[in-house]
């Protein structure tokens, strides 16, 4: 198996259910994302929080405008996550209060609208969000509401496969190949950020392979002794030492977590570790080769909430909530059974930056 990311190499959880087909992102307003913050500004403090609605703009473009036109040093700009360009998105930013009077300059940035602003006591930081609400139009579907609802019901019962989406792997899915060379050779050209991102793409592909292997082994909704499991209600992780935890996994209270290999992550034991080692062995990789990078664990699946399907003259509207760090494309591929999810921005997911 090679290191080029191809979505079709990863199995569907709902393989036995038909997809609705269709197209997404024909227009930016077809893909709407609303950030759900971990907290709201208190109304006092030295940091100004503001909510922007943007269309046709990446998060990075807004950051650069705040830096170059408003005059805020980039390290003082706060953002909880990155959002795609070809979408209509709402997300929070923060800047030091002393730049408050210059915020009106945002009127000069086409495609951006200021919705709210208030003060808070700390800078907004990566991962300071609960997740995202999505409202997505599937145009020209071949299936209808019943087919989409059947898939979403299964995903609500079993959890959404937490695959990394195409955004993570670059044009043509080649970034893991470049990351592999960096891991093996220990050096390469490019900025530290770029190197971290490329190795992150390799980590992400190995994680996706781990998810697929657990599915093939019948362990998607199970935990085994030696797994590190995540509690979905609290986010806490623990080592599975009691066979009785399997019942909690079946109820989607807990899920197995897979590795983003590095030097600082809880390592699985026994059978669970052997599954991880099998993925590494496919590519002749060893755990110690990732010691120069931080590590983390990521759940094999995420709960699906607030889901709804509505039929409209223009197609099917899907609404749902996913926790931070997960990808809407992982849900959409299950519903549509189509891999050509185009117009995706090749940006890293900052919610998982600690693992890179």
Curated annotation (Swiss-Prot):
Q: List the disulfide bonds.
A: none
Q: Which UniProt keywords apply?
A: Isomerase, tRNA processing
Signal peptide residue numbers: none
Q: Which SUPFAM superfamilies match?
A: Pseudouridine synthase
- Active-site annotation: 84 (nucleophile)
Annotated function: Responsible for synthesis of pseudouridine from uracil-13 in transfer RNAs.
PANTHER family the UniProt entry points to: TRNA PSEUDOURIDINE SYNTHASE D
Q: What is this protein called?
A: tRNA pseudouridine synthase D
Q: Write the lineage as a comma-separated list.
A: Bacteria, Thermotogati, Deinococcota, Deinococci, Thermales
């Amino acid at each position: 198996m090679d290191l080029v990311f191809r979505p079709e190499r990863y199995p569907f959880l709902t393989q036995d259910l038909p997809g609705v087909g269709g197209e997404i992102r024909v227009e930016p307003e077809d893909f709407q994302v609303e950030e759900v913050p971990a907290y709201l500004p208190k109304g006092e403090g030295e940091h100004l929080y503001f909510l922007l609605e943007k269309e046709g703009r990446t998060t990075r473009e807004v950051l650069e405008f705040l830096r170059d036109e408003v005059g805020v040093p980039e390290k003082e700009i706060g953002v909880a996550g990155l959002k795609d360009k070809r979408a209509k998105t709402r997300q929070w930013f923060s800047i030091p209060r002393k730049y408050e009077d210059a915020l009106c300059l945002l009127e000069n940035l086409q495609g951006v609208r200021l919705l709210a602003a208030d003060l808070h006591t700390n800078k907004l930081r990566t991962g300071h969000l609960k997740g995202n609400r999505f409202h997505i139009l599937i145009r020209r579907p071949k299936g209808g509401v019943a087919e989409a609802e059947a898939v979403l019901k299964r995903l609500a019962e079993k959890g959404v496969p937490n695959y990394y989406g195409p955004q993570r792997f670059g044009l043509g899915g080649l970034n893991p190949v470049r990351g592999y060379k960096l891991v093996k050779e220990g050096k390469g050209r490019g900025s530290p950020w770029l190197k971290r991102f490329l190795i992150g793409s390799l980590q992400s592909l190995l994680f996706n392979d781990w998810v697929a292997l657990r599915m093939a082994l019948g362990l998607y909704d199970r935990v085994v002794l030696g797994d590190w499991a995540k509690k979905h209600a609290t986010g806490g992780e623990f080592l599975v030492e009691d066979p009785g935890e399997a019942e909690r996994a079946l109820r989607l209270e807990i899920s197995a977590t897979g590795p983003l290999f590095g030097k600082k992550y809880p390592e699985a034991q026994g059978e669970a570790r052997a599954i991880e080692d099998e993925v590494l062995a496919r590519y002749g990789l060893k755990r110690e080769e990732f010691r120069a990078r931080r590590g983390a664990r990521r759940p094999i699946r995420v709960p699906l909430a607030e889901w709804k399907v509505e039929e409209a003259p223009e197609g099917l509207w899907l609404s749902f909530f996913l926790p931070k760090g997960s990808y809407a494309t992982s849900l959409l591929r299950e519903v549509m059974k189509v891999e050509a999810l185009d117009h995706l921005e090749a940006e890293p997911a900052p919610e998982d930056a600690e693992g890179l």
